[in-house]
Amino acid sequence: MEDSFNTTSSASTFTLQSSSETMVSIQLLDFRTSLLEALEELRMRRKAETQYEEQIAKIILETQELKWQKEALQNQKEALIKQHKEAMGVLKNQLQMKMYALEEEKGKYKLATEIKEKEIEGLKETLKTLQVSQYSLQKKVSEMEQKAHLYHLAKEDYHKQLNEIEKYYAAITNQFGLVRENHVKLEQNVQEAIQLNKRLSTLNEKQESEIHSLKKELKKAASELIKSKVTCQHKMEEESIDLIIKEQKYEELQERLNMELEVNKKINEEITHIQEEKQDIIISFQHMQQLLQQETQANTEIDAELKVLRENNQTLERDNELQREKVKENEEKFLSLEKEHERALGTWKKHVEELSGEMNVIKNELSSLRETHAKLQEHYNKLCEQKKTEEYKKFQNVPELNNENSDELTRKKSENIITQKYNSGPEIWGKNTKSFCLDTEYREEEKKDLPVGKTAEDLQPFEISAKSEINTMVSQDRNQSGMSPHRVLCLDKDATDQEQTSDVTDSRKSVTVEVKDKLCLEKASGCSEFKSLNNFFLVVDESLETEMVRLEGTEGLGLLHSGGDIPLDTRSNKASSNGMSNEMAHKRNYNTDGSESNPFKQQSKLLPADLENATEKEITNQDQTKAGLDSFLDIKLNLDPCKKHGLQDSSHVTLDVKHQKIKQMVREESQCSTEPRSCYQLASKAPQKPGGTIACAAVVSPLGPSASSDNKLTALKKSENSINTLPTAAKPAPSPAERTTRTNTNDIQNSSLRNHLGASESSVSVSDFQVNQGDSHTSQAKGLKTVVPLTTSSEKQPPSESQITETPKSGLSSLVDVTGRQCMWLNNRDKTEALNGILSGGTCHEGQLEEAHLSPATPSADSVSTSARSAFDLPSPDKPEKTPGYIKFVPLSPWPKVNQTKTVGTATPSIPLFLKEKTVDLSGSRVITPVTFCKNVVLDDTRKNIESDPTSNSRAADTMSNWSIHLDPKGQPREERNATAQTVYDSSFPTEHVKAEPLISTVQQSHSQTVKVTDSPDPLTFSPGNNDWQSLVMNRLTEIEKLLSLESDNQPKRRKVEEMLDNIID
């Protein structure tokens, strides 16, 4: 640069030196500025490069962390897949064992195929209902558009009115301006008049002063005249000339006076005239003041009206904006619902395809079973012949058996019941089903010992729980809310097989356990229960095999039988179970005492492990047991008199098939009413041949965890004279749709449970008696049957007894259809078998709760169908929680409809509790996956939290009615789950289009919250290996909880969390 400067300077030597110096200085300044700019740019680049390097390092670290997380998730996914494969392998082996057992029966699969077809029809009906709901939604949208159009028209009219008001206001302001101008003119005129008055007053004063001076002059003149007259007399002559002159002056003065007087008169007249004008002006001024006041008042009123109108306009504009926002939200919700509807249709189509595939598999299996059935029939006939000879021997040998044999037989029976549950597919045998088919052929067949290998295979998965007699996986009827506190009478494998054949006749019922001739063998534990404990009663029936469908409906009867002295007369149509239920409700309302007598208190303190005390109690009742056995034998020998007059024993009742029509009428009435929940339930099974006496054991059902231990023995410890009081829970405030029948004990002695057995023949469960002390808020839609689960907890109850008494009401449940098919559901919860060796009645399995939310549109919730994955597993969060309501758990069983998880009521609020708690192990040998969290709540506290927002319930029901969330391992997409969770909170979305589901009970909003993560009650459930599966489920839950917490805390990482969630769930 300096060389260039030198060259330029040498080249310009001819220029002046001053000019060259200035140019050089200018160039140097330019050079310095360019250098500074270059340095600054270099600094900026270096800073940017350092920042970029730091960002790149951070991004590399994040990518590495993401890769590590991805690898960890892949490892977890592979481990889960391996575990799932292992579990599926075990399940496949078990299913193969079950299929070998299922090949023994042909009729079941025929009915299974029919049921599948009916389910397909039911799915078609659900599709129709979905289409109807879509059409109703379209109607709603059109109505909303019409409302918006009308609103716009009203807005335009309002704007027009505002414009007119503004015009009126402008006219009024113009008139007001004119009035003001007139007022100003009036003020000016008044001022001028005042000035004129002042001038006139000054003139008047001047004239008065002049008049006064003239008067003085007149006086002086008069005096002078007098003097002049006096002098004139003396000087007439002299002053004659002077007088003439003075007279002339006097006349002139008089003329002046006259002129002045006239002027004064004129002035006075003018003054009076001016005063009158002043008064007129004052009057007009007052009038103008009044007008001005009126105008000002009118202006103030108009201003106030304008302010009000402006405020109204602003409020209307705000309302317009809110309405627009609501319309947008409704449109978005409608779009989301349409998307979810399309997804639901897709899932439904997938289900239809799966059902078709399963139907094909079942048809193939039927073809193979038809071949084996002929061989088995021959073997069966031989066994029947042998049983005829051995039947009466066992009746004679019954007194010789001791309690140890009965315990072993009970163990076998319970295990056979459980194996029968799995052999018959999703048809599960009830714990409380102590119906006895006394057909001689069946007895002989039962007495026939089967091959030891097959029975050992059936009983092997359950040997762990056989010692403590934990038959918790024994099914219970969906309408039966409790188990018998007594031992299930022993059952051989043939009896179980016969139960399977009878179960096929009524595929929608888990047929009661037929303990046909083992009654005699169970003298110590069976017959003592009939007579001494007074809570059992026999049902004598001659119904044929075609009538078994109706007779088996008595499994779900909500018969509360606290006193056994009730001869059942089926000719009566009146409900007789209400006074006793009132008594039980009274006891439950005072559940702090537990019961009215010491046996109840002692019973409430029994834990599931107290088996020895129960057996001792049985031994003390052996004398009464003998009497009960004798009465039972008398009933068998005297079958016809028992049918006519009722059994002589107070614990025996007769059931006449001829009154089925009358009972059908009672059943229809009971379906429309919200009957209370039953404490005892009748399970009867009709023999295929006449002459068979059916010994039906009423089953104790705990009213809730709070009253389960208290009310279980309301009939157990009472004497035979404590006659028929039925614990109907008297609701404090029943809804108009609910009927809580309240009858006195005297009325019940007359009616005596006839109607319930009658309804049982017509295959309708009368009702589960429900303790509605504010715990159930049943909202019944039109013609629908609501299910009201009860979740209350007792402070006295230990946590090991995780009893869920969310018992659906039978008369209102969707499981009861016109054909009278009923499903028995697993009651895997409560294990109060410490009473006499069998599970007491309070347990409610997840399958029972599962169907509590099914709509009547579902085809009576067949337990047989393997395609029952369409059972609704709906989240219904009644409270806004961070944990979303779409957490799903994969069932192990191929029949998830029976076994799948139901998140009851407040599933979402209770999930965090589930994540924090450990699973409750009811015994040392049994792993219970269902976990119940029942807070220790006093009934007053529960009553306070009963009433919920019916609109929120209806929205929850609407959500439930539309969405069928499947318990597949795949789960649903996150968007669907979020949409289903959001629809619950939609306050503005109309709910009329949705078919009214049974609402989740408002008890679910109370302190008792139930979460059941229940896998299939397969034999794997009783195996020690189930701990691994349980720990796996808990690990999944913990992972999901962590991911959800990340989702709530770190919003930018939501995509990552969603992918991780989907990977884990898949």
UniProtKB/Swiss-Prot annotation:
Species of origin: Mus musculus
Designated name of the protein: Coiled-coil domain-containing protein 73
Pfam families: CCDC73
Region (Disordered): 568-600, 719-811, 854-883, 944-978, 1003-1027
Gene name of the record: Ccdc73
Keywords on record: Coiled coil
Coiled coil regions, renumbered to chain: 47-134, 178-391
Composition bias type Basic and acidic residues, residue spans: 967-978
Positions with biased composition (Polar residues): 591-600, 742-781, 789-811, 857-869, 948-964, 1003-1013
